[in-house]
Curated annotation (Swiss-Prot):
GO terms for cellular component: cytosolic large ribosomal subunit. This is Large ribosomal subunit protein bL17. GO terms for biological process: translation. Pfam families: Ribosomal_L17 (PF01196). It comes from Christiangramia forsetii (strain DSM 17595 / CGMCC 1.15422 / KT0803) (Gramella forsetii). Residues 128-139 have a biased composition (Basic residues). One of its GO terms (molecular function) is structural constituent of ribosome. It comes from the Bacteria. The keyword Ribosomal protein applies. Keywords: Ribonucleoprotein, Ribosomal protein. The keyword Ribonucleoprotein applies. Residues 125-181 are annotated as: Disordered.
Amino acid sequence: MRHGKKINHLGRQTAHRKAMLANMACSLIEHKRINTTVAKAKALKVFVEPLVTKCKNDTTHNRRLVFSKLRSKEAVSELFREVAPKVGDRPGGYTRVIKLGSRLGDAAEMALVELVDFNETYNVGEKPKKKKSTRRAGKKKTEDTASTAEPKEASAKETKKEEPKAKEPKAEEKKDDKKEE
């Protein structure tokens, strides 16, 4: 029976599993997103969320607790320096797991793990404003060019009408020349 066994051991012994999760967490903090299997992604989410919660309160004690899990000075400093200000008002749910499908070699279910506040695709609050301003500017330019293009077209039509009239007298002159001869 499986009573009281809440942790996914991921087919590894304790030291190997802890080292793997620490390395994956350091990579996630450094790159803000990583690709891995779904099982590892779920285990990583459980591993990283409490660390990010601890980094919101920058004390020596919290830094030492996070360092004991991550074992990387660079990751700890980046977590407290860059990640903490962005997630300061978020009450949890700092990571997102997106399923990607099966891996080609062994058909393992793959997932993308990312820090929520560092993704530009889903953070649409800033981008649409930029797009709208560029679109509006683009439309005004096209309207200006369209309004300037219409008089050109009208003047082009007038010149076309004038040209056939100019050609017709030449034709008549030729006919008159032939009659006179």
